[in-house]
Amino acid sequence: MTLLERYQQILGALLAELQAAYGARLVACAVFGSVGRGTPRYGSDVDLLLVVGGLPRGRFNRVEEFLPVEAHLESVLTVGETGYPPIALSPVFKTPEEVEAGSPLFLDMVEDARILYDPQGFLKTYFDLLRARLRQLGARRIRRGNAWYWELKPDLKPGEVFTLLPTRAWLEAIS
């Protein structure tokens, strides 16, 4: 089994556990970072965006709700073929409302994330609209060695204010 196949196996098992744990509350799930780009290395963690309705307030409460998922996956995450290190999950938890409010984290996701689960198209629509807005602004991701940054509006004038995506406007686009 190749490293990429191992990550694919983990993602399949993970999605099944997420659906079992969150049920109808699971709105969407995406993998980002090196695994989302399809370029994991030995020891790469699995960066996840979990969009779940009715999440408890606070990161610790959200992690506590996620712990059974991780526990059920322990054998898949730790038992690999010889030479494969254990794999860590790094979830980011958002409610649909928090996704609508936006986050700088989503900038890279429009290019690098792979949506694993999104039955209503919520996350795909959000990413599509954000991607379109970035294009409209002329935004670009500028690479410097192994790092990058975003130039969101190259023609920005001093004192000018702009929005990436109005909080509720994108909802109207999918209605």
Where are these regions (language model features)?
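Metal-dependent nucleotidyltransferase catalytic core
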Residues: 1-21, 50-100, 106
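The feature captures the alpha-helical scaffold/lid subdomain characteristic of nucleotidyltransferase
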Residues: 1-27, 37, 42, 100-175
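Hydrophobic/anchoring residues in structured secondary elements
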Residues: 31-32
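Conserved N-terminal glycine/acidic-rich loop preference
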Residues: 38-56
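Residue-level signature of transmembrane alpha-helix interfaces in integral membrane proteins
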Residues: 44, 49, 61-63, 69, ...
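Short glycine-/polar-rich loops that comprise or flank the Walker A/P-loop
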Residues: 44-46, 86-89, 112-113
